[in-house]
């Protein structure tokens, strides 16, 4: 079945995520959930002290697609650093919009327990790579930073409180069809309506909502499933046809 169908797409994402989690459990790896948010200058709106949304005077006109490219560049630097340090990770990334349409990233990554602190510090370093001064205390005091969570946040996945796939499930559904989510608290809308908005936003700006990190390419798995389904429904009859007109040329 085609992944252009939202239900099929959501089911495939959940299956792939479950496969990663099962592998992580077999290997004794741990999961960490990360959130990356772009600096203030990428946001057209901001929330004031009284909770109202107002114009952001720091906004430099960057589009959502350009912001996503910025985050992708940070991830490229992060991935290179992790590779240099011998700290491999694998998992999934979800890109979704803030209330003002600015993209932010959620990443669920698996790693060796011994690499966890190094991975966290590396992702934090690059998340705060630019415009770090906007997080500094004013007037200057100790500690130097009030809070880095507007730009970078992380949370350990605790298997006793729920599995990693279940934790990521709502982010997958929120950006496909909103199934089993209820209301989208961040957007303050029913989840199915919020999913329509998220899909339209991603389509308009040409943003890739989901990305697999590490692991085998999904294309082979999809093709094997297609062949399996074709056999099941009798669509494949007789021996497979050679790719070339004359098999002698294969040599």
Question: Where would I find each of the regions flagged by the language model?
Answer:
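Short hydrophobic/aromatic beta-strand micro-patches
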Residues: 108-110
């Amino acid at each position: 079945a085609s992944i252009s169908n939202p239900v099929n797409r959501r089911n495939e994402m959940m299956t792939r995520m479950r496969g990663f989690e099962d592998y992580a459990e077999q290997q004794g790896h741990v999961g960490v959930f990360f959130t990356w948010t772009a600096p203030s200058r990428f946001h057209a709106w901001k929330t004031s002290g009284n909770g109202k949304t107002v114009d952001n005077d720091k906004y430099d006109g960057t589009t959502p697609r350009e912001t996503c490219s910025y985050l992708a560049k940070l991830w490229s630097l992060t991935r290179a650093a992790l590779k240099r340090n011998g700290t491999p990770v694998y998992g999934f990334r979800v890109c979704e919009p803030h209330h003002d349409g600015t993209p932010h990233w959620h990443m669920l990554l698996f790693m060796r327990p011994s690499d966890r602190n190094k991975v966290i510090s590396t992702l934090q370093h690059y998340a705060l790579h630019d415009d770090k001064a906007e997080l500094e205390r004013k007037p200057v005091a100790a500690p130097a930073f009030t809070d880095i969570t507007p730009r970078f946040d992380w949370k350990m996945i605790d298997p006793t409180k729920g599995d990693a796939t279940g934790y990521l499930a709502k982010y997958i559904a929120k950006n496909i069809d909103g199934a089993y989510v209820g209301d989208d608290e961040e957007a303050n809308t029913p989840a199915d309506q919020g999913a329509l908005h998220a899909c339209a936003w991603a389509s308009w700006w040409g943003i890739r909502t989901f990305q697999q990190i590490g692991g085998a390419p999904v294309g082979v798995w999809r093709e094997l499933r297609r062949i399996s389904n074709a056999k099941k429904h009798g669509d494949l009859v007789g021996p497979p046809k050679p790719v070339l007109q004359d098999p002698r040329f294969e040599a």
